Structures are given as C-alpha cells and as structure tokens.
Amino acid sequence: MANNIYHYYVEGDDEKKVIDTLKTSMQLIISGKVDVFNVIERKFTRNQIMRLKQGTIVVLVFDTDTNQVDTLLENILFLQKQPIVKKVICVPQVKNLEDELLRSCNIKQIKELTGSKSNSNYKHDLIQHKNLSNALKTHGFNIEKFWCKDPS
C-alpha cells in the first residue's frame, strides 16, 4: 500500500477538511491528493484524468441523500476504463457527512463538534476550524463507525 498513489474526489469543502485532517494530523486514512468534485452532479473529463499519475487509485466520496445516481455510475465506468487509473474505490456517506460525524462522534447535534451557535453554521465553522483533529478526539471520534454504514 505504501507505493500506491491515492486521489480523493469529495463533494464539498467540508469533506475536504475532514479528509485532510484524517490523513494528516490524525493519520487514520491513507494520504493522497484531495479535490472537491461532486461525482453525483458532474462528469469527469479526459483532461481531469490526464493530470493523474499512472497507477492512481481514485477514491470517490459522495452523499447518498439523493436518488440521482446516473452521473455517478457514468463516472465510475469512465474511470474504470482509464488505463492510468489502477482502481476506483467508492465511499458512500450515509446520508451525508453530518450523519457520518453524528454516528462516529459522541454528539447529539452536529453543532457540538465545532462549537457552532446553530446546526446551520456547522459547515462554515468546520471549514474554518483551526484544530479539527482535537475537536474530533474531544468528541470521541471512532473511525470504525465512520463510512461503515450500508447505504441500502
């Protein structure tokens, strides 16, 4: 695994912040480049793929709170056909990042994680958070409960 190149595609800046934290300061997931690209709504292009290094493992992180899967399926098939892509890994968030964090931390409301005044401020506060790894640890983050629920 140490020689593999990983490239994460995530839905938004909040997912990017969480993945960057999990792979760097917390060292809970494999390191790799992280780009914001909503694979449920947008299609990959050849130009995007040309920027990848040979043998890249592509990790798609996406919400499951939508029934629109056609573009996602097209993206998976497109990536699987690219010789530069070694493997495609899908990480469904059930139903979204907030639900994943609620499930994997000892919190009742998402605002508790960031100390936000309201749940609606959570995303902004998470993205701006200076020490997310500490906040996750303080609230008992359990990686084994994160991204583990079956989306069915």
Pin down the residues of each PLM region.
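C-terminal accessory helical subdomains adjacent to catalytic cores in phosphodiester-
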Residues: 2, 16-32, 43-59, 64-152
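Nucleic-acid-processing active sites and adjacent nucleic-acid-binding tracks
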Residues: 38-42
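Small/polar loops that bind or transfer phosphate-bearing groups
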Residues: 10-11, 37, 93
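Conserved helicase/translocase motor-coupling segment
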Residues: 6, 33-36
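N-terminal beta1-alpha1 ligand-phosphate binding loop
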Residues: 5-16
